[in-house]
A protein has these predicted regions:
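Central antiparallel beta-sheet cores of small beta-barrel/beta-sandwich binding domains
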Residues: 216-276
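Positively charged n-region of N-terminal signal peptides that target proteins for export
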Residues: 1-5, 22
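A short beta-strand micro-motif common to beta-rich folds, especially ectodomain repeats
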Residues: 88-101, 172-185
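Beta-sheet-dominated interaction scaffolds and their linkers
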Residues: 22-51, 116-135
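Beta-sheet ligand-binding and adhesion/scaffold domains
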Residues: 256-395
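Bacterial Sec-dependent N-terminal signal peptides
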Residues: 12-42, 100-107, 111, 191, ...
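Surface-exposed binding patches on compact interaction domains or structured appendages
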Residues: 36, 40, 49-81, 133, ...
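Tryptophan-anchored aromatic micro-motifs
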Residues: 121, 198-223, 238-241
Length: 395
């Protein structure tokens, strides 16, 4: 009898334990009671919608805390909508599906946008003056909005290509426009510059301007860039007077691919009076070093400012070792070529020299050049602030 009672007691305890387990589990997630039948909620970067179809034991509700995801429920279908992803990085959000006391999580994924415009390694287009049209590979996973800043420039995106067209430039001057693209409201506008320029566009009258190494004043020589020198030789030449009778001619190089003027150091430019052989000599105004070597230490990249002004800063091109070729001197020698043994002295010390084309049709107020660390920066000044240089021998 005792044995039978023990067995009965054990059975009651097992029944009680089993009942307690079921009661404790009530209200917690039970996997498998909400089933995902199908879903298409992995998106590219565009704003778009997808759905999740479920089988659930009761009415379905859904929750997602990500602000770029919105949801609605229509029976067993959950509608999911995402905004555009204006980041290169992908993003994920957790969608929590609930039915009664049960829930199930599923991930909403959206990839970052992809934009790839291939100019063959270049970051801007530098063209000749002839009419131009070319389609460039262009991949964008977001819809593009494209415009241009100039009537002579057009850009059309279609079938994975951006077709850029420019009308013939017959203005006689370099010109620059911009292709402006964005991914619609909320995205930042991006630009690609397109310049049309040939060597002949550089011909004309210029301010050959600089900060005077003695006074710091912004001054200039009225000058001309021409395609023929006084001896009838073809090329590119900068001509200017350093007195009423003495004309200097500085030979220039021309890089047509990059639209850059190359300046070779220590070129014989002409005579000052009957005794002095004038040369352009590169100068690091910080260290005080000068160099008599016949090398290309300085370049001047042609630019077109927003008002149409043609502008070229004469800057260091990195070939003078640790020295900075940001300035130059007009230097007198007792003969040519320029050598240490025949130097006489500097006539003009030119800090941050630049060329600015004089154009009637452009806002041609000269641009001041000043030092900001190692960088150059431009600021418009009035023409009254710019003084024609009146050279005085300083040696």
């Amino acid at each position: 009898m005792k044995k039978l009672l023990s067995i009965f007691s054990i059975a009651v305890m097992l029944f009680a334990f089993s009942s307690c387990e079921n009661e404790e589990g009530h209200g917690y997630e039970i996997a498998g009671n909400i089933q995902i039948v199908s879903n298409n909620i992995s998106f590219d970067a565009n704003a778009q919608s997808g759905t999740v179809e479920v089988i659930a034991p009761g009415a379905v509700t859904v929750k997602c805390d990500a602000p770029w995801v919105t949801t609605s429920v229509d029976g067993s279908i959950i509608n999911v909508t995402v905004t555009r992803n204006l980041s290169l990085e992908g993003r994920n959000a957790v969608l929590t599906i609930m039915s009664g006391n049960e829930k199930k999580n599923i991930t909403v994924a959206q990839r970052g946008y992809v934009f790839d415009l291939d100019f063959g390694g270049a970051t801007e287009l530098k063209l000749g003056d002839a009419a131009f049209s070319k389609a460039y590979p262009c991949k964008s996973t977001l819809e593009l909005e494209i415009s241009t800043s100039a009537s002579w420039l057009t850009a059309v995106y279609s079938d994975g290509k951006l077709t850029i067209s420019a009308e013939e430039n017959n203005t006689g001057n370099p010109r620059k426009g911009y292709i402006i693209y964005s991914f619609g409201p909320g995205s930042e506008e991006q630009t690609v510059s397109v310049m049309q320029c040939e060597k002949s566009d550089m011909y004309g009258d210029y301010y050959f301007a600089f900060n005077d190494g003695g006074t710091g004043a912004l001054q200039y020589f009225p000058s001309t860039i021409t395609g023929v020198n006084s001896d009838g030789e073809a090329g590119l030449f900068l001509q200017f007077n350093i007195s009423s009778t003495d004309v200097m001619t500085l030979p220039l190089g021309w890089d047509d691919t990059n639209k850059v003027i190359n300046i070779t150091n220590a070129q014989f430019m002409g005579m000052y009076g009957s005794s002095y052989y004038m040369h352009n000599i590169v100068w690091d105004e910080t260290s005080g070093y000068i160099n008599y070597g016949v090398y290309n230490f300085q370049d001047a990249a042609v630019d077109v400012l927003d008002d149409g002004t043609v502008y070229a800063e004469i800057v260091d091109n990195g070939t003078w070792g640790s020295h900075i070729a940001s300035s130059m001197m007009l230097y007198a020698f007792s003969g040519t070529p320029a050598e240490k043994d025949n130097k006489v002295g500097s006539l003009v010390r030119m800090i941050y020299p630049f060329l600015q084309k004089m154009q009637v049709e452009a806002a041609a107020s000269p641009k001041a050049v000043s030092r900001d660390g190692k960088r150059m920066r431009k600021a418009t000044i009035s023409e009254a602030d710019l003084v024609t240089y009146d050279p005085n021998l300083k040696w």
